From Swiss-Prot:
Positions that bind ATP: 521-529, 543
Record topological domains on the Cytoplasmic side: 462-833
InterPro entries recorded: Bulb-type_lectin_dom (IPR001480), Bulb-type_lectin_dom_sf (IPR036426), EGF-like_dom (IPR000742), Kinase-like_dom_sf (IPR011009), Pan_app (IPR003609), Prot_kinase_dom (IPR000719), S_locus_glycoprot_dom (IPR000858), Ser-Thr/Tyr_kinase_cat_dom (IPR001245)
Span of domain Protein kinase: 515-800
Intervals, Extracellular compartment: 19-440
Annotated compartments: Cell membrane
Ligase keyword on record: no
Native organism: Arabidopsis thaliana (Mouse-ear cress)
EC number: 2.7.11.1
Residue numbers bearing the Phosphothreonine modification: 674
Protein name, entry field: G-type lectin S-receptor-like serine/threonine-protein kinase RKS1
Stretches that traverse the bilayer: 441-461
Length: 833
């Protein structure tokens, strides 16, 4: 019965035709291709450039730019288009120069005794060509075990200990010749495993040893989120692989014929490959750049990047003086060889030396490692084997001879301990103490200077206040009630913060034509905004606090200090401020296209915004918020994101403005609590509006509302349908599969892809979910907007579409009643903006 079953499947697979599979009796001729099941990869014949030579390989099927990831006959091209791919009589997948099968070009070369008569060749969606038996499911050969120059996700680099399989990358000869080049990236078999890029037989660049999360020579290698790195070192194999958690992300790593290694990601919007990271990129990356027992210190070097390790001196001082480091360093002549008083100097942020000759013990601690090194006179240095593992620093690496290819990094690397005698140890300790004394002396001097400057400023401000009482203003305006004690404290703050440029009141009056009504651009929550022109013809916008402004000195100082410290393409740029004669004013760059609400909430102007422009505005706002939340020196929560606070320059680039209510978070602080709720009805997250609780997810909520308003051209709080607001209406349509009905009908349908708009609506709904923990963060939003992501999570019920109970566990944040206006205005405790 078993024999009949095998024969049945044998004949079935001979005559079954599949787009991703070559059957035993089928052939693939030049001009024909097979596609993987998801049509991500193609396998067939190809040529490069204007060449007539034909190769058989694998490439991306959905990318317009030809990108080859694997070549079968890389060193044996076919001269014309008469080639053919088919199974040989003995069962190997083979490439022939012609259909008469007389000239064999390439073969999978599996032992005949292993092959089965039911073999097929299948191309997977990972880009892996697999020779396997569909009856037993056994795999006999796969292209992932024989890579060329490209390292794809879920491929493995390394070697197996039993059968000797070596998976390494070999560069092309040139851009137009995929033949085997000189550059080879392989896993070292000697010592502690590491990846080294060779040029011929000479080490060119060292990827380093595994740290527990990444390779020591690639500090920019990402950890987690989209990319997952994995390293295996056991009795069967030593290998490295990486995967992607988002199937829409297309990425590859390759060895270039020029001697560099690159990680590329595909940017579908721009139809191009983005260079995610590349190495080597500086002198310190070159293998053994500073010779034996030297290390490269490029980040802190002003003249020569090479330094001898502690206890060593240049082997050839004259060459070293002439910036020739090839001779490296040797042990200092007077240094004792082995003594009970030996110690270790710790070097921080190091790429540890080549581990080919290092000994390793993964079962001892770093403290035990130090003791063992001291007891062994041949031990010259030690370090943790995995310093970034989930269990912390584990394992012990020891060096017993010359140390090659060490360097420092600015914000990465690990601790490296060099053995020195007692004299050298005392010298390093003295240098460390003298450095601390210098820092202490500098701090004392700075404090004294600040105190002296404060006293001087106190005298200057007091004299200015006296003179101001007797001086009348040339401007005809109504002054705002103002606390002079606050003004004085602001003057003190100016002395401590040199990033606050100051404008003279007369300069502002002249620039705005005495605050002429013709120069008035509009009025915000804290007062009118005027256009001005300085004497150098520079156009400015002046925000002048009105008499009824709820913004006090703290909010005023907050906005000035925050914006002066922030620099980003999508944040409004402050030019300075003016605090004089009871006036408080902010001076900004002038943006001619006003604010976003002028465009999206007015039919005539909204018609000018096609889909590409709206998407660029959305992406710009997202990048600006991400900068505030994650990439700036300060973690900042804006708390008042809305359409009127998004300004547009002459090129319609969005700029986030109005930081009066922003809050600074500490590096590890995730959320805050306030008894004074400020913001704009319709844009505030529920936990903030009702409980006084705010976090970066509060801004995410506001962004989601703003994004949905941009897509629909409708205002959230002014939307009157059966649902309570625009968000609720969109949710109802989304639930019923009718969300396309809400797309702004003023947009030309030819300018947008309906699937992309639906994706953006889904992202907006992911931002406005009721529970803050369910909302995506801004880094995820930026990635979703930048990639053709298709597997987005399903949004949960948004906020403010049904009754929500106020208070709860964190309701104590609000100690007083919060006034809320149904109009689209910002509000505070008891008064509207």
């Amino acid at each position: 019965m078993k024999v009949v079953f095998v024969i049945f499947f044998f004949f079935l697979f001979q005559f079954c035709i599949s787009v991703d599979t070559i059957m035993r009796r089928q052939s693939l001729r030049d001009g024909e291709v097979i596609l993987s099941a998801g049509k991500r990869f193609a396998f067939g014949f190809f040529s490069l450039g204007d060449s007539e030579l034909r190769y058989v390989g694998i490439w991306y099927a959905q990318i317009s730019q030809q990108t080859i990831v694997w070549v079968a006959n890389r060193d044996h091209p076919i001269n014309d288009t008469s080639g053919m791919v088919k199974f040989s009589n003995r069962g190997n997948l083979s490439v022939y120069a012609s259909d008469n099968e007389t000239e064999l070009i390439w073969s999978t070369n599996v032992s005949d005794s292993m092959l089965e008569p039911t073999l097929v060749a299948t191309l997977s969606d990972l880009g892996n060509l697999v020779l396997f038996d569909p009856v037993t499911g056994r795999s006999f050969w796969e292209s992932f075990d024989h890579p060329t120059d490209t390292f794809l996700p879920f491929m493995r680099l390394g070697f197996t200990r039993k059968d000797g399989l070596d998976r390494s990358l070999t560069s092309w000869k040139s851009h137009g010749d995929p033949g085997s080049g000189d550059l080879i990236l392989r896993m070292e078999r000697r010592g502690f495993p590491q990846l080294i890029l060779y040029k011929g037989v000479t080490p060119w660049w060292r990827m380093g040893s595994w740290t527990g999360h990444r390779w020591s020579g690639v500090p920019e290698m990402p950890i987690g989120y989209i990319f997952n790195n994995s390293f295996v070192n056991n009795e069967d194999e030593v290998s490295f692989t990486y995967g992607v958690t988002d199937a829409s992300v297309i990425t590859r790593t390759m060895v270039n014929e020029t001697g560099t290694m690159h990680r590329f990601t595909w940017i579908a919007r721009d139809k191009r490959w983005n260079d995610f990271w590349s190495v080597p990129k500086e002198q310190c990356d070159n293998y053994a750049h500073c010779g034996p027992n030297g290390y490269c210190d490029s980040p802190s070097s002003k003249t020569f990047e090479c330094t001898c390790l502690p206890g060593f001196e240049p082997k050839f001082p004259r060459h070293w003086f002439l910036r020739d480091s090839s001779g490296g360093c040797t042990k200092k002549k007077r240094a004792s060889i082995c003594s009970e008083k030996d110690g270790f100097v710790k070097l921080k942020r190091m790429k540890i030396p080549d581990t080919s000759d290092a000994s390793v013990d993964m079962n001892i601690t770093l403290k035990e490692c130090k003791q063992r090194c001291l007891k062994n006179c041949s031990c010259v240095a030690y370090a943790s084997a995995y310093h970034e593992s989930k269990r912390g620093a584990i394992g012990c690496l020891k060096w017993h001879g010359g140390m090659l290819d060490a360097r420092t990094y600015l914000n990465s690397g690990q601790d490296f301990y060099i053995r020195v005698d007692k004299e050298e140890l005392a010298r390093w300790n003295r240098n460390g103490l003298s450095g601390k004394r210098r820092v202490l002396l500098i701090l004392i001097s700075l404090i004294a200077a600040v105190m002296l400057l404060t006293v001087i400023l106190f005298c200057v401000v007091r004299e200015r206040r006296k003179s101001n009482r007797h001086r009348s203003s040339s401007a005809n305006f109504a002054p705002v009630p103002f606390d002079f004690d606050e003004s004085f404290r602001f003057e003190q703050d100016k002395a401590r913060n040199r990033e606050l440029p100051l404008f003279d009141l007369n300069t502002i009056v002249a620039a705005t034509n005495n605050f002429s009504s013709q120069n008035k651009l509009g009025a915000g929550g804290f007062g009118p905004v005027y256009k001005g022109v300085l004497q150098n013809r520079m156009e400015i916008a002046v925000k002048r606090l009105s008499r009824n402004s709820g913004q006090g000195m703290e909010e005023f100082k907050n906005e000035v200090k925050l914006i002066s410290k922030l620099q980003h393409r999508n944040l409004v740029r402050i030019l300075g401020c003016c605090v004089e004669l009871e006036e408080k004013m902010l001076v900004y760059e002038y943006l001619p296209n006003k604010s976003l609400d002028y465009f999206i909430f007015h039919e005539e102007q909204r018609a000018e915004l096609d889909w590409p422009k709206r998407m660029e505005i959305v992406r710009g706002i997202a990048r600006g918020i991400l900068y505030l939340h994650q990439d700036s020196r300060l973690r900042i929560i804006h708390r008042d994101l809305k359409a009127s606070n998004i300004l547009l320059d002459s090129e319609m680039i969005p700029k986030i403005s109005d930081f009066g209510m922003a809050r600074i978070f500490g590096g590890n602080q995730m959320e805050g609590c306030t008894s004074r709720v400020v913001g704009t009805f319709g844009y505030m997250a529920p936990e903030y509006a009702m409980e006084g609780q705010f976090s970066i997810k509060s801004d995410v909520y506001s962004f989601g509302v703003l994004m949905l308003e941009i897509i629909t051209g409708k205002k959230n709080s002014a939307f009157h349908e059966e649902s309570s607001n625009l968000v609720g209406h969109i949710w109802d349509l989304w639930e019923n599969g009718e969300a396309t009905e809400i797309i702004d009908n003023l947009m030309d349908q030819e300018t947008y892809d309906e699937r992309e708009v639906m994706k953006c609506i889904q992202i907006g709904l992911l931002c406005v979910q009721e529970n803050a923990s369910d909302r995506v963060d801004m880094s995820s939003v930026v990635i979703m907007l930048g990639h053709n992501a298709t597997n987005l999570p399903n949004p949960k019920h948004p906020a403010f579409t049904s009754a929500r109970r106020r208070g709860g566990e964190n309701g104590a944040c609000l100690k007083g009643q919060t006034g809320i206006s149904v109009n689209d205005v910002t509000f505070s405790d008891i008064q509207g903006r």
